Amino acid sequence: MNGAMSLPFLRLYLLVLLYFSANAILNVIIPLQGGALGANNTTIGLIMGAYLFTTMFFRPWAGQIIQKHGPIKVLRIILIMNGFALILYTVTGLGGYLVARMLQGVSTAFFSMALQIGIIDALPEKDRSQGISLYSLFSYIPGMVGPLVALGMWQGGMNYFAFGMIAIALVTGVVGYTAKMDKPQTQPSAENTDHHVNMFHSFGQLVKNPHLFKSSVLMLVGSIVFGAITVFIPLYAEQMENGNAGIYLMLMAATVVISRFTLRKRIPSDGKWHPKFMMGTMLLLALGAQCVSYSIIGGVVFFYVGAVLLGVAQAILYPTLTTYLSFVLPPLNRNVLLGLFIAMADLGVSLGGIVMGPIADIFSYSTMYQICAILAMVMILFSMERRKILVR
């Protein structure tokens, strides 16, 4: 494979687009369906959070299993599980949604790790940031049209929803089973390490390794904000005059896609920590959350400006931290440690629904988003680097 934009990689990005298209629809359908059935914010947050909360637990093992068996073998098995989860949505209610979200969470843990590890291993160092950025970009393209498609399904009847989930499951499976990846030229031998010792040692690295710790905390807090936005915007928009959740989510996703494509070459790919770059990213996150909070008073202009600011922040944060860690983590257990880092992103999105849901029940959506803005402001200070971090 030559470069992140070569034909084999474009095929992988197409698979990413198809896989995550279901979630772009589910992120709108589940809160609306839950609200229609009388579920409160806590229940809706629990169901939505179960997806990535489950993913979080399986990420580290996913990285280890993929390192042992290779991404393609794992990918093909996972696509079957994902198809079953999507079909389960079509024949159950809220209780079944919880089970389906958990199955989908397991699938996503292995799917995303398989694709990202395959991309990182196959690309030269100078192209890594572009590869990760394009992976992230294609995972967000469905968000440009998914929310509007979901609203159309909601208004037209759940039969359209059932047909859509089945179609996505089938097409994703076909594309996934024909995908190919180059094997990495060098890779640590699985036989040379004790997997169980490695795993528990790796959990300790989450705190002991300063690179992993700093990146994980930033990703955790950023993901809490993104999770709160994803879960509760469909319900928050209903309280706002002229507010439209479909337009908001589409605008935010479009911003992510455009930003990731236009800024992909500006994302650092040198293995160094760039404090000013990260502080600016967290400032965008804080301003975006504050705009969403204030929009209940200030109007829809602040609502949609918040979508743009949060979209830019989301476009930058994940690929920047992932690329940085791909350089500074020890090669022997890099895949497992990357799995732990991505698990922090999963945990954050889950907490955005599970923890912020009760806060919205007790206070209001506006107050909940105000708290998100405060958390992001704290992370601006956390992004400051007291000592120079270089690749060892």
PLM features: residue spans?
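Symmetry-related core transmembrane helices of the 12-TM Major Facilitator Superfamily/SLC fold
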Residues: F161-T178, Y369-E385
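Paired small-residue
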Residues: G95-Q104, V301-L309
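Juxtamembrane intracellular "pre-TM" segments in multi-pass secondary transporters
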Residues: M1-S6, D182-S216
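Helix-to-loop junctions at the C-terminal end of transmembrane segments
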Residues: F58-G70, S259-W273
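Cytoplasmic helix-loop-helix junction between adjacent transmembrane helices
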Residues: M102-S139
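Central cavity-lining transmembrane alpha-helices of secondary-active solute carriers
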Residues: G49-A62, M250-T262
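Structural signature of the two symmetry-related core transmembrane helices
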Residues: K73-I87, K276-Q290
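Helix-loop boundary and gating motifs at the non-cytosolic
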Residues: G3-I47, L52, H211-L218, S223-Y236, ...
